[in-house]
Amino acid sequence: MKKKLGLLAMVVALMAITAGCSEVNQPITPKSTGIWNEYFVYPLSQLITYFANLFGSNYGLAIVVTTLIIRFALLPLMIKQTKSTKAMQALQPEMVKLKEKYSSKDQATQQKLQQEMMQLYQKNGVNPLAGCLPIFVQMPILFAFYHAIMRTSEISKHTFLWFDLGQADPYYILPVVAAITTFIQQKLAMAGTAGQNPQMAMMLWLMPIMILIFAINFPAALSLYWVVGNIFGIAQMYLIKGPEIKASKAGGSSK
């Protein structure tokens, strides 16, 4: 069920991206219409602008601060999602035994398997859907922030550190840092799950490569958002999964 929900989450994300692509080059203004623009993108654009004005038209610093605010706001959801994932992982040995017991693919056997799986969840107080809800809540917020960065026209007129916020980083520093921090964040997220999910192992390498390609071709403002978000995510993983990360490192060093 979780695999199906994960696939559904990916489909929803793809639909959101596809639907938003037609608007991503249109500046966000008070006159922008639609629920998406009025209640998601424009408020985040205004939040960036507010901090930029507060910091003397420093839009780079405004993106950093707004990213941190959003990440802190989403932190309780991430903690809940991680706890749910850990609870599901703890049940994996028993789940494997059930699947071996009911290995036949006929409908009656599969129904019996589903019934016993649900009983196992209830017995251990685990909700298989609890880990998916935070994903669906986070996706529109993070995607709206991406839109706010891309569609706030004032951002492209400013610089931050060594780069122009409206252009790709000419030295490729941000794209490389974004890719590396993506890899580290995912590596930490996988701590304690090695060998349990080959698809996650593949994504460990695929996601950083995708981020690198996107960051090379997108404005540096978006790369800055990725880097700050990833660094926060790394700290978040140490906060939530500290013991597992230490155990994973100890296991790796002993081999």
UniProtKB/Swiss-Prot annotation:
This protein's name: Membrane protein insertase YidC 2
Covalently attached lipid (S-diacylglycerol cysteine), positions: 21
Localization of this protein: Cell membrane
TM region positions: 59-79, 129-149, 160-180, 202-222, 223-243
Similarity comment: Belongs to the OXA1/ALB3/YidC family. Type 2 subfamily.
Organism: Bacillus anthracis
Signal peptide stretch: 1-20
Disulfide feature: none
Membrane topology of the entry: Multi-pass membrane protein
Any one Gene Ontology cellular component term annotated for this protein: plasma membrane
A UniProt-annotated Pfam family: 60KD_IMP
GO biological-process terms attached to the record: protein insertion into membrane; protein transport
InterPro entries: YidC/ALB3/OXA1/COX18, YidC/Oxa/ALB_C, YidC/YidC1/YidC2_Firmicutes, YidC_ALB_C
Chain residues carrying a lipid of type N-palmitoyl cysteine: 21
Primary role: Required for the insertion and/or proper folding and/or complex formation of integral membrane proteins into the membrane. Involved in integration of membrane proteins that insert both dependently and independently of the Sec translocase complex, as well as at least some lipoproteins.
This protein's UniProt keywords: Cell membrane, Chaperone, Lipoprotein, Membrane, Palmitate, Protein transport, Signal, Transmembrane, Transmembrane helix, Transport
Principal localisation: membrane
GO molecular function terms attached to this record: membrane insertase activity
PROSITE patterns: PROKAR_LIPOPROTEIN
Superkingdom of source: Bacteria
Keyword Cell cycle: no
